[in-house]
């Protein structure tokens, strides 16, 4: 009798098992919990958004309190035009970083109430990002131009700062309109259908997908020819990066040339003492206040280039790559680089606070330590203290450079009144940006 359960009798049954993607199917393994609530990259992005938001609000609020405060301990020195430009930069940074981070956090955490609001929400978020980034860049350019005018033409006609600032805000809003119409919103991404078994290859990485329930903004360039994406990427790079960097390069180049031509000359070691008590700096040397403001403008320009360059470089590389035109707005790389670009708005106020003097003891100690590191020690014996820390007595007798004995004529031809010692130079510290 033939065995009914032998393999030769039973027909081969079709394989009706459904392949389960790793992390996307039902968790049928006993003793294990539910899958994570989101991808690690999304959680890290949310943490960075929160940190940048807190840092930006704290720094820019401090700058606004110092510049706009009345007479409290937060009030800083008043400089009319630069105060106005720095206040506008702080407001632009709050708008760029705070508005974008808040909208992005609300987008990620609250989810999507309706599918009909997808396009409006995506376009509004894109308008916030592009206009805030442009306003901050335009204010940095205006500060560099104002410093260039103050260094090269100190007695010339001042720049119309208020009109130029209003033009910068308006231009940022107008240039942000095209990016607002190249994105569209989708409903929350459902669970993707499983692919056929023949399409799965061993060792192949899983395809890029959206987390279930996550809302994404998609570009409109996927079904269009490739040159549409290239034209838009070129416009975005020129309007948001190339044009501001060109103006910043010209202004900072002029600042560096003036700084180099008016650099202070090293004093001679064996030069005889002058009859005047206070040796004023050479007329060709720039005042220390202008040098500090020049450094602040250069640092703001370098910070803008360093934070914005990765985003626009990756944008152009994705547009001109040989691969298929992917969804740039929905990729994780775009979101990560956008967070890096927002760090520019969070760090700008701390550049001003670093160069600006304050009443905080910790800040005074920091300036003292930095000044002792970056400033050359004065070699005059009259400026040195004794072994017990006691200073010379003449500092009480000639405390000011206008001591009246310095202007007396010689008593006779045979003898001259000994000149008073040179005044002690000011401590080299980053006290004020102006």
Swiss-Prot record:
Primary residence:
membrane
Q: Which domain of life is it from?
A: Eukaryota
Q: Where are the transmembrane segments?
A: 4-24, 44-64, 82-102, 163-183, 238-258, 294-314, 335-355
Family to which the UniProt record says this protein belongs: Belongs to the G-protein coupled receptor 1 family.
- List all topological domains (Extracellular): 1-3, 65-81, 184-237, 315-334
Q: Which gene encodes it?
A: GPR150
Basic residues bias locations: 398-407
- One biological-process term from Gene Ontology? G protein-coupled receptor signaling pathway
Q: Where is this region: Disordered?
A: 188-210, 398-434
Name of the protein: Probable G-protein coupled receptor 150
Where is the protein situated, by its record's location annotation?
Cell membrane
Pro residues composition bias: residue spans = 189-205, 417-426
């Amino acid at each position: 009798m033939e065995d009914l359960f032998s393999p030769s009798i039973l027909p081969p049954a079709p394989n009706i098992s459904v392949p389960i993607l790793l992390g996307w199917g039902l968790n049928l393994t006993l003793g294990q919990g539910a899958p994570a609530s989101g991808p690690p990259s999304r959680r890290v992005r949310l943490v960075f958004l929160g940190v940048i938001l807190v840092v930006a609000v704290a720094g820019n609020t401090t700058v606004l309190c110092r510049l706009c405060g009345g007479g409290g301990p937060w009030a800083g020195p008043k400089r009319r035009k630069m105060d106005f430009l720095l206040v506008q930069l702080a407001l632009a940074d709050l708008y760029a970083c705070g508005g974008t981070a808040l909208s992005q956090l609300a987008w990620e955490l609250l989810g999507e109430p309706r599918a009909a609001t997808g396009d409006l929400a995506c376009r509004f978020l894109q308008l916030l990002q592009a206009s805030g980034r442009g306003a901050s860049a335009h204010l940095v350019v205006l500060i560099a131009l104002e410093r260039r005018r103050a260094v090269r033409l100190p007695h010339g006609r001042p720049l119309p700062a208020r009109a130029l600032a209003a033009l910068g805000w308006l231009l940022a809003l107008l240039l942000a309109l095209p990016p607002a119409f190249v994105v569209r919103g989708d409903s929350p991404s459902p669970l993707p259908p499983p692919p056929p078994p023949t399409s799965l290859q061993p060792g192949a990485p899983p395809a890029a997908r959206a987390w279930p329930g996550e809302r994404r903004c998609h570009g409109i360039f996927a079904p269009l020819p490739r040159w549409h994406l290239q034209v838009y990427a070129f416009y975005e790079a020129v309007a948001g990066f190339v044009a501001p960097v060109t103006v910043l390069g010209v202004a900072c180049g002029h600042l560096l040339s003036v700084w180099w031509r008016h650099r202070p000359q090293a004093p001679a070691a064996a030069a005889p003492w002058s009859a005047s008590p206070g040796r004023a700096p050479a007329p060709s040397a720039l005042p220390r206040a202008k040098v500090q403001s020049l450094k602040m403008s250069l640092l703001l320009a370098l910070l803008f280039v360093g934070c914005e360059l990765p985003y626009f470089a990756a944008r152009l590389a994705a547009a001109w790559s040989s691969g298929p035109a992917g969804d740039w707005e929905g990729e994780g790389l775009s979101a990560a680089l956008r967070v890096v670009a927002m760090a520019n708005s969070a760090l700008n106020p701390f550049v001003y606070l670093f160069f600006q003097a304050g009443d905080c003891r910790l800040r005074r100690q920091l300036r003292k330590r930095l000044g002792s590191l970056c400033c050359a020690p004065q070699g005059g014996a009259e400026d040195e203290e004794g072994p017990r820390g006691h200073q010379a007595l003449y500092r009480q007798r000639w405390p000011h450079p206008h001591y009246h004995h310095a202007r007396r004529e010689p008593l006779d031809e045979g003898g001259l009144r000994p000149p008073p010692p040179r005044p002690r130079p000011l401590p080299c510290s980053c006290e004020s940006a102006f």
